[in-house]
A protein has these predicted regions:
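Rossmann-like S-adenosyl-L-methionine
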Residues: 1-7, 13-17, 222-468
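Terminal RNA-binding accessory module
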Residues: 1-74, 111, 153, 373, ...
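Short, acidic/hydrophobic/Gly-rich beta-strand patch recurrent on exposed beta strands
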Residues: 20-25, 149-152, 217-219, 360
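Short, conserved phosphate/pyrophosphate- and ester-handling motifs at nucleotide-, phospho-/glycolipid
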Residues: 38, 168, 298
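Extended interfacial segments that mediate partner engagement and assembly in macromolecular machines
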Residues: 59-70, 79-190, 210
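Short, solvent-exposed loop/turn elements at beta->coil junctions and helix N-caps
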Residues: 118-125, 193, 200-202, 447-450
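Internal alpha/beta scaffold segment
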Residues: 157-201, 222-254
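Structural signature of eukaryotic scaffold interfaces centered on beta-propeller domains
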Residues: 206-208
């Protein structure tokens, strides 16, 4: 099969991350992304490597027997959701199957390696679950009217205005509509990615699930030719605050970003209304969150994730960490560290993002926890500098997993038990092989779905040292 070949096939399975395996009438297999098992699809081969063909999805000729009608009018055009036409229980089955295959391919099956795969915990909310969205300004087609929303599937430039997005609640949709209406009426240009000219770039919206507090951050360039920026922003603030919401506004912000890269970057933020932060609650703890703070995007799902992790860590003995030191590596804003602090002597968190470390320290103080210590720096380097030795290690690395040299240093501590929380099962499978080669065995695994209607999945693994 050569590059440029156009063909059809039936998707027999989907591997993580979202790689459909389509089988042609001749028995050839082609990887086609954004597909669902059972679909008959048309594809064009765009890559052939090591006799493995990859194709671009052109059309779904026949729906899968798994599919129902899509609840979102933007589905298939918007690049956000992939599994929205699949009933939620079937989504969970698909994700569990994908993770099980990756893990068994890497370290063997449950029977071969002696671990227990507990299953998968679903998200408490299947729709309207996100507490954060980053919308982009642009157009839906070249020289078209102003759009505000998500990138179209497979496009770096074209957008779809997601006024009926189903993974956020009505307050997000109201804010999007109010913002788009206001800047469209005032003929304000968006920042063109090709020419680097224009004003409007992104709209960052965050809403706490538990407290209902809302914060909005408008991200723009500093190119203000043709209008009075102060008057424009005052009108924007008024357009937002005069709408009706279920939650309540905590702050309206304006961030400047002249970077040519199409990412939200903070080069200076001013408060247009209220405060530059809001509060969210998880499992009885309170967290102060700024527009650019890392925080799990599904608050209720995060509670399931962290409660499951805590059960893995403590097991049946709730006093097992009394008097002991816990390392929380890749600690982010310190959520897990603060959940474990009440049941151990000390938690030491290490995180490379300084702003996240500052937030972790502030939140620990907010929750009255004086036995949390947070250090800013690369885990690989910081481990050489910490005097306290751990009795237990919690790992929650970014998507790329743990650097092999860092794994080596972690293993050298020789702790009896560890828990690894992963947001990318391919990275997890690779890292587990290293741990097992160096004297650890996998005891149990559980998946937690934080992202309904997408292919993303969290996985928690308990590791036990075998050569003690």
């Amino acid at each position: 099969m050569k590059k440029g070949f156009r063909g059809t096939g039936t998707v027999e399975r989907v591997d993580f991350p979202n790689k459909g395996i389509a089988v042609t009438d001749d028995g050839d297999r082609v990887i086609v992304k954004n597909t669902i098992p059972g679909q008959k699809v048309e594809f064009v081969v765009n890559k052939v490597k090591h006799q493995r063909a990859e194709g671009r999805l052109m059309e779904v000729i026949e729906k899968s027997p798994l599919e129902t009608e899509e609840p979102c009018p933007h589905f298939g055009i918007c690049g956000g959701c992939t599994y929205q036409t699949v009933p939620y229980e079937k989504q969970l089955d698909m994700k569990l199957t994908q993770v099980k295959k990756l893990i068994s391919d890497a370290i063997g099956t449950e029977k071969e390696s002696g671990y227990e795969f507990i299953g998968i915990h679903g998200s408490p909310k299947k729709s309207e679950y996100r507490n954060k969205m980053e919308f982009s300004f642009g157009d839906e087609y070249k020289d078209g009217p102003l759009a505000l929303g998500m990138h179209k599937r497979g496009s770096f430039y074209d957008l779809v205005t997601v006024t009926d997005c189903q993974i956020v609640d009505e307050d997000f949709r109201t804010i999007l509509k109010a913002t788009l209406d206001y800047f469209s009426k005032n003929n304000i240009p968006y920042f063109h990615r090709a020419t680097h000219k224009g004003y409007l770039r992104h709209l960052l919206v965050r809403k706490a699930t538990k407290t209902g507090e809302i914060i909005v951050d408008l991200v723009t360039s500093t190119q203000t030719e043709g209008f009075n920026e102060e008057e424009l922003l005052a009108g924007f603030r008024y357009a937002l605050l005069t709408r009706q919401y279920d939650g309540r506004f905590k702050g309206v912000l304006h961030t400047k970003n002249d970077s040519v890269a199409d990412v939200v970057k903070n080069e200076g933020t001013e408060v247009l209304y209220g405060d530059s932060y809001f509060y969210e609650e998880l499992l009885g703890l309170k967290f102060k969150i700024t527009p650019f703070s890392f925080f799990q995007t599904n608050s209720l799902g995060a509670e399931v994730l962290y409660e499951t992790a805590r059960e893995f860590i403590l097991g049946d003995d709730k006093d097992s960490l009394n008097g002991k030191t816990v390392y929380d590596l890749y600690s982010g804003t310190g959520t897990i560290a603060q959940l474990m602090a009440p049941v151990c002597k000390e938690v030491v968190g290490v995180e490379i993002v300084e702003e996240a470390v500052c937030a972790a320290k502030e939140n620990a103080a907010l929750n009255g926890l004086d036995n949390c210590k947070f250090i800013a720096g690369d885990v690989l380097k910081v481990l050489d500098e910490i005097e306290e030795k751990p009795d237990y290690i919690i790992l929650d690395p970014p998507r790329d997993g743990i650097h092999p040299k860092a794994i080596g240093k972690i293993i050298e501590y020789g702790v009896e038990n560890m828990v690894y929380i992963s947001c990318k099962p391919t990275s997890l499978a690779r890292d587990l092989q290293i741990f097992m080669d160096r004297g650890y065995r996998v005891e149990k695994i559980c998946c937690v779905d934080m992202f309904p209607n997408t292919y993303h999945i969290e996985t928690i693994v308990a590791l036990h040292r075998t050569d003690l």
